[in-house]
Amino acid sequence: MSDVADPRPLISAGSASAPPRFHMLAKPSGSTCNLDCTYCFFLSKEALYPNEASRMTEATLEAYIAQLLESHRTPEVTVAWQGGEPTLMGLDFFARSVELVEKHKRPEQRIEYTMQTNGVLLDDAWGAFLAEHGFLVGLSVDGPQRMHDAYRVNRGGQGT
């Protein structure tokens, strides 16, 4: 008899036909951001690849979505966007991503969308789009305004 516990209870939520859900996160704008937060480790990454585009192309977007949806064997799939700052890709990019999800999803798949953003570029058009498609939006805020503005600054050093 082994001293190792049976791992099957850890994965019992799935079965051979429906394994447990997994979550994939896309960073379509790479490390590009419209802020210059004092504690950010990500901004310096841009300098590591000065000759490479950091924006996801439409061909890459379609391949990513097709592979993401094909690889999920559960009825619920989360399409998650993060950055840098994902809204720098523009609203048209995300509208296209929703179109591509509709094109590639299987009939039984239910899609959930999430986005983590600093919110600087959000406006009424973004709000309408995110609401229409049921996005769960995480908004990055660092506490009270004086604390937030001390750390989350724009490229001119001003609080956001």
Where are these regions (language model features)?
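Radical SAM/AdoMet-radical enzyme domain recognition
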Residues: 65-66, 70-80, 89-160
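Pocket-edge positions in alpha/beta enzyme catalytic cores
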Residues: 52-56, 86, 156-157
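Glycine-/proline-rich flexible loop or hinge segments
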Residues: 47-49, 76-84
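N-terminal [4Fe-4S]-dependent radical SAM core
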Residues: 1-26, 44, 72-74
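Canonical Radical SAM [4Fe-4S] cluster-binding loop centered on the CxxxCxxC motif
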Residues: 19-59
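Short glycine-centered, acidic/aromatic-flanked micro-motifs in structured strand/loop junctions
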Residues: 28, 83-84, 117
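A short acidic, glycine/proline-enriched capping/turn motif at secondary-structure boundaries
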Residues: 31, 47, 86-87, 120-122
